[in-house]
Amino acid sequence: IRQPGLERAIEFELEHLNEMGDPCRKILILELMGKHSNIIFCDEDRNILDSIKHVSSHMSSVREVLPGRKYFLPQTQEKSDPLTISEEEFIEKVCKKPCSISKALYTSLTGLSPLISEEICYRASIDGSDAALSLNETACIHLYHTFKRLIDQVKEGDFTPNIIYRCLL
């Protein structure tokens, strides 16, 4: 089991015997991306054998997810690594984007989802729907330190999962 970088994808490498009795490998990939989530089954060369959702070129200009095609993760080369980003790079990448603060976070940093981006804004007492360009330097530095505290919690395993139950009577 492995996770490529901080991507929202998990790969399971499976070994089995083929019809001739020879050992073979297959890869089962779970992409955890909200409404775009998918489960993709590949051979050892990462050729797609099948997937839960087939994605054609008409549905996505980024990549096709179809049997016979090569599997690859969508490119994230313009995104920064949240584990190593400096304060200066954070200000440049996040606070100078022409979109909402929340969107600036998840489109600038690998592995962040819209939900965790909203949580970072909430913890910083900032409205995530405000424009990133509207943040002054002090607010942007505060957002960075709030983000950094959350990342440090994740690195150290300092969190407690919870189940929230709400009765609608």
Go through each PLM region and give its residues.
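Phosphate/anion-contacting hairpin/loop surfaces
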Residues: 2-169
